[in-house]
Amino acid sequence: ILEFTRQGIPVERLVAFLDNLMDNPSKRAVDELYGFLESSGLPITDDGHFLAYKAVTKDYMDKHSRSISNAVGEVISMPRNQVSDNKEDTCSHGLHFAAHEYASGFGRGDDRMMVMKINPRDVVSIPSDYNNQKGRCCEYTVHAEVCSCLRVDSQRRRPTGVQLCEG
């Protein structure tokens, strides 16, 4: 934050992010989240939340149980103590979010790619075996639907711009 301030880069969203992060009761999640965001290239919003991705079915249902609607505007939550906080449990209980590259690997045919808005306080774990590409949380808001990837950074294989669906 100090370096950004010296360079004249606005820091308000980072300050808001840190405020939200400090509300997270998990030291491990606090320690791991920024590294996840940095390596995934995921943005921090003005209110200090962050955006991540999730592949869902064509009718906006989750791909695992096909019982949770992930339509834009939905707030999805579960009790925090039912989310696996063990980062060594790579596929386990919880609400999943991911970097674009990882999430796009789950999309098939007419599946949809959604943008999730997540408060840092709700992050429970960042699994250890996916190079900081996915995580688990206890709550997220479905923020938008991705209609297309505008550009992909060929070296880092991540989108540098996405087009969100209108409506």
Protein language model regions, located:
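Generic alpha-helical propensity signal that fires on short helical segments
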Residues: 69-71, 132-136, 158-160
